[in-house]
Swiss-Prot record:
Substrate binds at T57, D132, E157, K187, D191. Its cofactor is NAD(+). It comes from Xenopus laevis (African clawed frog). Belongs to the adenosylhomocysteinase family. It is an enzyme of class 3 (hydrolase). This is Adenosylhomocysteinase A. PANTHER family: ADENOSYLHOMOCYSTEINASE. Its EC number is 3.13.2.1. The lineage of its organism: Eukaryota, Metazoa, Chordata, Craniata, Vertebrata. Homotetramer. GO terms for molecular function: adenosylhomocysteinase activity; NAD binding. Residues 184-351 are annotated as: NAD binding.
Length: 433
């Protein structure tokens, strides 16, 4: 392992710029700061060697430094070839944390970066995984199965990665206990909804400068991400059409006043298309052929499988790169398609991703999950678990002061009437916020 690079980033000279930006992000991430305040002396993650595969952004930098403050050794790669913020990566690498990430990796470089995080500098392998999308989890299970027995747990950040964990569990291939961070209420109902509500528009605007008011926007999927995207597009004056497979989500969309139809129909009407489903083959060749001239097409689901970019590359008459992560395709019918971020995450490929405050919710859950799996290993046989409701409420509580929120306290009489502890949890596990 002696020939291993101590880090690989785009430009280490960006570290000072990154450090200034990280300091600002810290002030917007009260949950992570609370974790440092509570645990930096006891260091509950001492001995943990955490391999992380998650967008290497300023917010992730605050997460990494929280994990190290709590005693962990950490190595990091990004979970998307376009999502790294190079100044953030440089700032973390300069502190001595091995980071292997830069914006604009090839697919081969992407896998190489992940592999660099498997073994630490002393030759010892990872014993914890912090994942976003499942690529690190899948790589270790398929290529490094001899290491699985030494791994105490996996914490998974996003919907796509959680789907992957449940598929592995049902097929019997999952060999490590995992916590589903995505479905913590303070993750899915905040990051997925409010984060996308702001960062989608940021990505589209930075990439295209398009006027959204008056346009027809098509949002594929009406889960938490789709809800946030639809709200944002409507707020900017677009007429929004939803596509859905689930009758419950479709009914929700209709009751909010959105038109709900199929992509075959919507592709003829839209000017802006956003996929949010986490599923494959949402926009296919026939849909591109239906679209109006210069329709803008983008994806905010984790992988680039939602849009048939391969069809565009094979069937377009011409492809012109307008600027980084913005490509204009000329189709045989004479119309153009503007594709953002090559069909990958538009909010991170074309903008800066979610704001720090909402990511503090998600990443505080990640820290709690890592502590839980590392310190209470015996409680977690192989399977997929949720964080307890009490911890979910604690994440929310850590963010209230920053917003000037004053919480009402139950009286003894009220608590007795409701059958609750005055300090919570306040809702049953099955409650749908």
């Amino acid at each position: 392992m002696s020939d291993k690079l101590s880090y690989k980033v785009a430009d280490i000279s960006l570290a000072d710029w990154g450090r200034k930006a990280i300091e600002i992000a810290e002030n917007e991430m009260p949950g992570l700061m609370k974790m440092r305040e509570m645990h930096s002396e006891s260091k509950p993650l001492k001995g943990a060697r955490i391999a992380g595969c998650l967008h290497m952004t300023l917010q992730t930098a605050v997460l990494i430094e929280t994990l190290t403050a709590l005693g962990a050794e950490v190595q990091w790669s990004s979970c998307n070839i376009f999502s790294t913020q190079d100044h953030a990566a440089a700032a973390i690498a300069k502190t001595g944390v091995p980071v292997y990430a830069w914006k604009g990796e090839t697919d081969e470089e992407y896998i190489w970066c992940i592999e660099q995080t498997i073994y630490f500098k002393d030759g010892k392998p990872l014993n914890m995984i912090l994942d976003d999308g499942g690529d690190l989890t899948n790589l270790v299970h398929s290529k490094y199965p001899q290491l699985l027995k030494g791994i105490k747990g996996i914490s998974e950040e996003t919907t796509t990665g959680v789907h992957n964990l449940y598929k592995m569990k049902s097929s019997g291939t999952l060999q490590v206990p995992a916590i589903n961070v995505n479905d913590s209420v303070t993750k899915s109902k905040f990051d997925n909804l409010y984060g996308c509500r702001e960062s989608l528009i940021d990505g589209i605007k930075r990439a295209t400068d398009v006027m959204i008011a008056g346009k027809v926007a098509v949002v594929a999927g009406y889960g938490d991400v789709g809800k946030g995207c639809a709200q944002a597009l409507r707020a900017f004056g677009a007429r929004v059409i939803i596509t859905e497979i689930d009758p419950i989500n479709a009914l929700q969309a209709a009751m909010e006043g959105y038109e709900v139809t199929t992509m075959d129909e919507a592709s003829k009407e839209g000017n802006i298309f956003v996929t949010t489903t986490g599923c494959a083959d949402i926009v296919e060749g026939r849909h591109f052929e239906n679209m109006k001239d210069d329709s803008i097409v983008c994806n905010i689901g984790h992988f680039d499988i939602e849009l048939d970019v391969k069809w565009l590359n094979e069937n377009a008459v011409k492809k012109v790169n307008i600027k980084p992560q913005v490509d204009r395709y000329l189709l045989k019918n004479g119309r153009h398609i503007i594709l953002l971020a090559e069909g990958r995450l538009v909010n991170l490929g074309c903008a800066m991703g979610h704001p720090s405050f909402v990511m503090s919710n998600s990443f505080t859950n990640q820290v709690m999950a890592q502590i839980e799996l590392w310190t209470n290993t015996d409680k977690y046989p192989v399977g997929v678990y949720f964080l307890p409701k009490k911890l979910d409420e604690a994440v929310a509580a850590a963010h209230l002061d920053k917003l000037g929120v004053k919480l009402t306290k139950l009286t003894d009489k009220q608590a007795k009437y409701l059958g609750l502890d005055k300090e919570g949890p306040f809702k049953p596990d099955h409650y749908r916020y």
